[in-house]
Each structure stands twice: as structure tokens, then as C-alpha cells.
Amino acid sequence: MHHYKGSEWNKWDLHIHTPESGMANQFGNDWDKYVLSLFKSVIANNIAVIGITDYFTIDGYKKLLTDYLSNDQKMKSLFTPAEISAIKNIAIFPNIEFRLKTIVNGSRINYHIIFSNEVAIEDIEENFLHEIEFVYEGLPFDTPNKRKLKRRNIEEHGRSIKEQQGEFKGSDFTVGCTTAVIDEQQITEILSKHKDKFEGKYIVAIPVDEDLSKISWRGQDHMVRKYFYQVANMFFATNRGTIDF
């Protein structure tokens, strides 16, 4: 006689930003404090899967894996043996957040690609991120100046914006991330181009409450909303009504 387990539910949190995101956060650049807080909270809340999120890069995910999870001495200096054992059972995925060129009520749509942790960091960077282009700050009437989506290019873009528009504050990277936009068609084409590396190893997620819910089904952007509902594999939602729907 065989016993088959029925449906099993786990808590997932796939949208956790790191200090590398360039956002204001309570940790600043104190990565030890961030990692301590992250995993103690995840363990306390019995979360099984997390998505380590950054804008346009996987720098935070890479740092977490190389400087902490792969560093036994560092982990032992921060956590108890029981905590380390619990951390090893947590699935950790890289989540890249893009700001798209599509505008909804004055705001850009955010678009997430969450990769399997089986995909090598080098493949995500070299065969995906660094093949994406964004429009770099240029001069009026010039041909659009495009740059590869690399951290130094984002920083240069942010620095140029700050020099021209004094109201932009924050680091060069923060301003670059705030103003850089991506065409989602590029993302789709590049992922399709490298099917041998990525097929079946990523999902598309969109924060429906922040973005898509602002688009009226009865307005001129009806097809925009419909398109993103069709391409998304999952939605981020905190609104009770959205979840029930």
C-alpha cells in the first residue's frame, strides 16, 4: 500500500530587495546586518522560497551567494548551527526587476524575470543582461544613444542625468535605475535567442496592484493591460480584492 501526499502549501517571498538595489533601506551598505535580518525573518516566518531582487542586475544575489552562502566561516560568525541548517533548506532565486518604457498614469510598469537557481550567474549576466540595451542620456536631436545594460553604463547614465537636472538626488546608480527604461520585447527576444540556457528556467512576474490595476479595461490602454496579463506567469499582489479575484 502506498501513501501519496496531497497538496502541500509553502510560504514564498519572491520580492526581497538587497542593498545593491540602490534604494533607501534600513541597512545602508551593511551587508552583515542585512543578511542577519533577512534569514532570521525568513526562518521565523517559515518561508521556504525567496527571490533576491535588484533593479537591472543580479549583484545582490551574486554577493549573497559568493560572500555569504558559500563562505562557511562567514556564516558561522553570523548564525547558529541550527540556523545554518535551516538556511540550507531555503530555495533562493535571482529576481531582476526592470522598469519598462510602457507608462501607466505617469508611472512605468515594473517587470520581473525570476530565474531558476540552476542557471549560472555568468549566463544570466553575459547571455541576458549584457545583451539588453537601454537609451542612454544624449543630446537633443541626436540619434538615440544606446548602451548595454551594465552597472557602469547605468551609473554613467545617472551621473549625466544629475549634471543636467539638479533635482535628481542619490547615487549615480540610483538615479540611473530610476530613469533607465527597457523594451520588454528585447527581454523576450533575448530569452528566446538563448533557449538552450534559459528555456523552462524563468518566470515573468508583474506587480498587478502597483501597475496593471491602474489601467482601465474601458480605456485606450485596454490592450496594454491585456497583453501583460497574457505574458505574465504570476502576479505580485497584496490587495485582498486582487488575491480573491
Each model region followed by its residue ranges:
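A structural signal for short, well-ordered beta-strand segments and their strand-loop junctions
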Residues: 50-52, 92-95, 203-207, 236
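Divalent metal-dependent hydrolysis catalytic cores, especially in the metallo-beta-lactamase
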Residues: 39-58
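Divalent metal-coordination and catalytic microenvironments
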Residues: 15, 54, 92, 113
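An acidic- and aromatic-residue-enriched active-site/binding cleft used to recognize and process polar
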Residues: 17, 54-60, 97, 209, ...
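Domain-core and long-helix interface of multi-subunit machines
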Residues: 1-35, 40, 67-70, 74, ...
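Extended, helix-rich scaffolding/adaptor regions
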Residues: 57, 85-92, 97
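Short mixed-charge
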Residues: 70-90
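Internal, well-ordered alpha/beta segment that forms a basic, Gly-enriched binding/recognition surface
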Residues: 97-144
